[in-house]
């Protein structure tokens, strides 16, 4: 049985667990219930009406948060030759080809986003076990496998707050919206960007209710149930 400390128990007293809150109200409540000694992350969890085993119902995409994630993002680029020089000019924190791959195989993971040119992917693929489980593997569907001329745009997006989302095996999408220290309006605008991107990425094989439930929570706080109608309206549907 899971037990929670006094701070959690005090926080949950502020929450009506039978209610579904409007996004702005839920954000304010989640911020009030954030009682950890560190700046907690604010996350949204969406239960989708999708079958993770159905190839026509896969959900994966990218959202750019207008107010970022509240942290410095280190960007790595896999590239060689002229493309490696382009990565340097575009402002990548780490860049390289074969030697960089060896460095990662040896344990280097001091980066938050990985980008690759298409020609490097046959080599980068062998890092699947290392990068894949950490959500760092470059992927064309998430816009991180690009030609050198797109490096600047993708790197700038990553630094501004580019976040990837993907349906997990339980049919849930987990996505970070920012920090508990953010102003409520900043988190609301980040949430709007995320919901809009998820709705725009609706798979062709989706049937029935697309978003079945939505919750907001800080790292150590209780989940706040969101009003589905209000959430869906954020994406213009």
Swiss-Prot record:
GO terms for biological process: regulation of translation; translation. Keywords: Repressor, Ribonucleoprotein, Ribosomal protein, RNA-binding, rRNA-binding, Translation regulation, tRNA-binding. One of its GO terms (cellular component) is large ribosomal subunit. PROSITE patterns: RIBOSOMAL_L1 (PS01199). InterPro entries: Ribosom_uL1_bac-type (IPR005878), Ribosomal_uL1 (IPR002143), Ribosomal_uL1-like (IPR023674), Ribosomal_uL1/biogenesis (IPR028364), Ribosomal_uL1_3-a/b-sand (IPR016095), Ribosomal_uL1_CS (IPR023673). One of its GO terms (molecular function) is tRNA binding. NCBIfam families: rplA_bact (TIGR01169). Part of the 50S ribosomal subunit. Belongs to the universal ribosomal protein uL1 family. PANTHER family: 54S RIBOSOMAL PROTEIN L1, MITOCHONDRIAL, LARGE RIBOSOMAL SUBUNIT PROTEIN UL1M. This is Large ribosomal subunit protein uL1. It comes from Dehalococcoides mccartyi (strain ATCC BAA-2100 / JCM 16839 / KCTC 5957 / BAV1).
